[in-house]
């Protein structure tokens, strides 16, 4: 992201929407979070591979609901605290009223979902944990006010071996 490689002609030719995240699996290129997750779920099904979603139909639906909400709402927060605040440098600008309202909404929803001391939303890891933690980390990494239990949840998700391996690879 820092090098803006996702705006290079080669990237744009390979990935239809030229968006990040992007997945290159062999000769198959795909962008957009939801499409990537659905592809991975189909290409690497459980039980041979770790499931991306909870086993229960209601928990799975709740996880997908949360993901859809994260992607479709909170636009002011996403604009004012892009993922660059996590991976590159914090923003020195305070949140606007709209950004603060989105942050407050995120914190309210996350606080209602993350139990005290819980590392996961649904008892065991699922992809919605990673997405929620990444969204919360837009605030945490920037030093914006976030309740301690949510900071702990973000740290627990960020400490996952898969996340650490990806961070080292991208670093």
Task: List each model region and its residues.
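GST-like domain detector, emphasizing the conserved glutathione-binding G-site
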Residues: 1-97
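GST-like fold's C-terminal all-alpha helical module
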Residues: 70-159
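Exported/periplasmic ABC-transporter solute-binding proteins
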Residues: 169-170
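Conserved serine/cysteine hydrolase catalytic core
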Residues: 166
């Amino acid at each position: 992201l820092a090098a803006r490689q996702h705006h290079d002609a080669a990237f744009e030719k390979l990935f239809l929407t030229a968006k990040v995240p992007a997945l290159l699996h062999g000769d198959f290129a795909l962008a957009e979070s939801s499409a990537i997750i659905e592809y991975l779920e189909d290409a690497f099904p459980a039980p041979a591979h770790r499931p991306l979603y909870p086993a229960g139909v209601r928990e799975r639906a709740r996880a997908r609901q949360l993901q859809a909400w994260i992607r479709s709402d909170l636009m002011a927060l996403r604009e004012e605290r892009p993922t660059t605040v996590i991976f590159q440098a914090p923003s020195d600008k305070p949140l606007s009223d709209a950004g603060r309202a989105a942050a407050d909404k995120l914190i309210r929803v996350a606080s209602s979902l993350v139990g005290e001391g819980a590392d996961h939303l649904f008892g065991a890891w699922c992809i919605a944990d990673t997405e929620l933690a990444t969204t919360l980390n837009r605030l945490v990494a920037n030093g914006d006010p976030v309740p301690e239990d949510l900071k702990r949840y973000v740290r627990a998700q960020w400490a996952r071996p898969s996340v650490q391996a990806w961070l080292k690879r991208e670093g």
